[in-house]
């Protein structure tokens, strides 16, 4: 094994450093310099920028295989820091951005789609390591695929519900549906490149899954406690969710939605209570239920923005 490790990391080895930097490039830009990250052979795609790939590989070796150094080099480059906005001219000349004419932008992986609202809401439990956890899942799924329906899924309570998605217990015959909807591999086989789909079911998960509804309520509590003025609350909400301030038109639209939600939940207290009791975390009873439910609706909208679940 030592001989193999020395062979793989030998400066004269033509493959290891190239595969490594291509993988990191793919993580940052969405697509590797060699698009077929799983195949560097003759049947794989040719690199879009072969000289850049070779330079990064030699730089990795020169830096003694310092991954952090290479990542810092890439993210501080002018190429990475470009705006992801596209013009008709750029779209016509470089539709798939293989020429790197604009900054990278794509939907986050399934695990990050779930972790992001937990972090924004303050629910994310940041413990590192430990046993697998079992977050919310629809009732009865395991029974339907188990022998004699004896295998039951029991969700965790407390911090286990809010751990990072990488710690989620994975049953290969019944993977977590919330993450499978966002193209998480089923782990039956090794997957190097994930698919990225865009389906109506994904929007329904973000709007209705208990994880996201509960995160919206916890986020709403943060927003309300931030400031007493709606304008400042909305600014804080946008900064937290999408790392920018709202445009005037966005502010007006969300303000109208907030007013409508306040009116609805004031008239329908049962609907407000039903919304606020989703999930296991404790509800802040110092906030009036109708007000909290209205801001929960606003928080849910912000957490469902394409901008929120996409890498900017």
Segments predicted by a language model, with ranges:
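Short Ser/Thr-interspersed hydrophobic loop/turn segments at strand-loop and sheet-helix junctions
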Residues: 170-175, 183-184
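A broadly conserved detector of short glycine/acidic/proline-rich loop/turn motifs that flank catalytic sites
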Residues: 124, 170-172, 210, 302
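Primarily short, surface-exposed interaction patches in extracytoplasmic proteins
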Residues: 1-162, 179, 185-195, 207-290, ...
